[in-house]
């Protein structure tokens, strides 16, 4: 595994997230909440903040996906987002995007950017 320690950090093992599921994280020593959606060997990582009002998307721990598992859902106002792009495709913030976090899988580990993007204030 090759980690650029100045730019990346290990979030977790890929196997810690079942395929087709999502999991939320509070990175160590950070106030930034992120969540990961796993699709096979690929992951999509976003800041856990809805662009409608910049509040967390999940109503309960790790509840980020629609019942079918095909979309990310903000349970506060019912906005639906594409897993692949983070774009709101239904609800109060159509056309707005979740904030993506640079991430990759290397040797079974999920690596994310050390410096995370921030939602607007």
Language model features: what each stretch is:
Residues 1-67, 82-83, 97-121:
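N-terminal pre-ligand scaffold of iron-sulfur
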Residues 50, 74-77:
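Short cysteine clusters
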Residues 64-73, 88-96:
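Short cysteine/histidine-rich metal-coordination sites, predominantly Zn2+-binding motifs
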Residues 81-82, 90:
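Short beta-strand His + acidic residue motifs that chelate non-heme Fe in jelly-roll/DSBH
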